[in-house]
Structures are given as C-alpha cells and as structure tokens.
C-alpha cells in the first residue's frame, strides 16, 4: 500500500503506536495518512486560534521531511492529533516532570500518563517528607467511590481514595460504569483494559497505606505507587506509559529497588527507569559505591543523573522527565 514506510520494523512501530483506526475502511492509517492527520490538525489549530496560515510550500516541505523521518514533531502529538488532542492539550507533550511532594502528585500522574505523556518523578527526601503522615489506624467505611468512565473519572476516583486513606478510611469502590476490557477507545484510540488494572491499583495502594500506619510514606513506597499507576496505562495489552524515578544517593532502599529477583515480588518496578539525583559532587567512596550497586543489581540501575549540571541550564526547581533515560551515560557511535 502506498504511503507506507519501506523499512518493515519502522512501519510496524508506526502502525502499532501512532496510526489511528479508520472505522469506515476497517483498517489502520498508513504512515502518510498519519502525517497528514497531524498537519491537518496543526494547520487548523494555527488558523483557528492564531489566524495564521503558513506558506503552502513550507508546509509541503515539512510534510516530506516528517514522512521520511528527517525531522519529527512530538510523537505524542502525532499519536493524538485530532479529537483527543483537541480535547486536552496534555496529550500533545512527550514528557513531563513532577515531584512527589503533594497528595495530588499521584492522581495528576495518573491523568498525565493516561493522556499519553511520559512522566519523570522524584522521590527524593526533600519532596516525600512534605507528604502528610498516614493515620495510626485505617478502617473500612460505608463510603463508596464511584469511578466514572473517563480519564478524568479514573484520576478523580483515585484522588478520592487517597484523600480517604489519609483520613484513615478505606472506601468501597464501584466500577460498574466502566466499559469492559477490549472495548474500543474511539477518541484516544486502541482498546480499553477494563476495570481490573484500576482495581489492582486501588488494592495495592490500600496495602501500602496499611503497612505505613502512624508514619509518612517512604520514598520506596511512593516509588512503588507511582510505578503501579503506570501499570494502569495499558491500551489493548500494549504498555503506553514511560516513567523515570529520581532518588537520593543515600537512599539504600531505592538503590536496591531492582536488585535480585525484583520482578517476582515487585513487578510494577519494571514501569520505571531509576536514577540517583546528584545535587552536588559526591566523594569518591560514594561514587564508587553507587557504580558497584549498579553493577551488582544486574539490571543496570540506578542510573546517574547530575541535577547540578542541568541547573546551570535551567534555573527552575524542575529536574527531569522520562526522556533522559539512559542517554545519561550511553554513547551512540555514528
């Protein structure tokens, strides 16, 4: 079929990750149709909101370069251009960052991930220590959290659960309004995972809180909750979440998060790449110990991220997002 990518692997990625389903034609878009959809959306956006129409020759030149992958726009925007991106601009961003320093960090992460945007997060002590303590007792109540069938509905329900847990209450969860697994998602594309991943997240979160009664959540517990949130974002059996977690150099539990057979006891940890965040130059003993920990883990984690170096470029408190991954210390030969 014309408009496809010659390289079969690249074409598979384009079809499986970015092409929308054409209901009337009972097929997926070709790569050319995906590129056209993206440009149609952006040109309409510029015209409607800024009263700007780029030169047609420039548009055609840009289209050709995107088609041949010489330059690429935000791939999240390529995936969502149309009704999904029109509904929520968050769906147009590749990456984001959030410190886990507020009870809202968790449900906001869920919403951002469900929009298709990657999330970098930090469970450094300076952030996690701002969270409220878990009550001395947590008991079941007659309160019912009703989950609405939308991204906002899922995030809102999770926010309600967390608020109740921090108030010492375990509510009942009503997921009767959610569409079944396999149902087509017409706006975002793909198919629904059904209510089970959300139920699993709620159960997991309740368990973590029960184990933390009378104290604040630890960084590793916040990390695990964030990773479990990432598990929810599965569309048609395909993982759609990208995450990276930053932690302190002296956080031994985070350093060992992917040591041993971690995937058996904590499979949710596969959802995030982990890096230690250096805010100042460590002494040689610390540095060597971190590299030895990385080697001993057999997973290549934690990675090493120099926050101070980034601070020279950006004066804000924001740190990193899911795209830094292991480009931090992987060199690509040309």
Predicted feature descriptions by range:
Residues 1-312, 316:
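Extended catalytic cores of very large enzyme megasubunits
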Residues 317-334:
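Positively charged, low-complexity/disordered segments
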């Amino acid at each position: 079929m014309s408009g496809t990518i010659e390289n079969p692997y690249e074409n598979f990625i384009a079809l499986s990750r970015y092409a929308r389903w054409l209901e009337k034609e009972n097929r997926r878009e070709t790569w050319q149709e995906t590129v056209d959809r993206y440009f149609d959306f952006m040109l309409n956006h510029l015209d409607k909101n800024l009263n700007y129409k780029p030169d047609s020759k420039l548009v055609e030149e840009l289209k050709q370069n995107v088609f041949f992958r010489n330059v690429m726009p935000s791939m999240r925007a390529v995936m969502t251009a149309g009704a999904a991106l029109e509904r929520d601009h968050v769906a147009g961003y590749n990456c984001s960052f959030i410190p886990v320093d507020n009870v809202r960090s968790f449900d906001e992460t869920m919403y951002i991930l469900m929009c298709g945007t990657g999330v970098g997060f930090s469970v450094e002590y300076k952030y996690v220590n701002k969270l409220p303590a878990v009550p001395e007792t947590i008991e079941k109540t007659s309160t019912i959290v009703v989950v609405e069938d939308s991204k906002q509905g899922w995030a809102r329900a999770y926010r309600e659960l967390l608020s109740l847990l921090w108030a010492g209450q375990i509510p009942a969860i009503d997921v009767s309004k959610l569409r079944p697994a396999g149902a087509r998602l017409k706006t975002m594309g793909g198919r629904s995972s059904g209510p089970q991943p959300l139920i699993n997240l709620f159960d997991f979160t309740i368990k973590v809180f029960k184990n933390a009664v009378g104290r604040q959540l630890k960084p590793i517990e916040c990390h695990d909750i964030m990773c479990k949130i990432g598990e929810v974002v599965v569309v048609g059996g395909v993982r759609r979440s990208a995450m990276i977690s930053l932690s302190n150099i002296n956080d031994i539990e985070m350093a060992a998060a992917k040591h041993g057979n971690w995937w058996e006891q904590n499979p949710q940890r596969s959802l995030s790449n982990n890096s230690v965040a250096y805010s100042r130059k460590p002494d040689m003993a610390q540095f060597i110990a971190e590299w030895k920990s990385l080697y001993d883990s057999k997973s290549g984690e934690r990675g090493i991220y120099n926050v101070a170096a980034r601070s020279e470029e950006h004066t804000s408190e924001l740190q990193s997002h899911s795209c830094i991954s292991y480009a931090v210390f992987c060199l690509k030969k040309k």
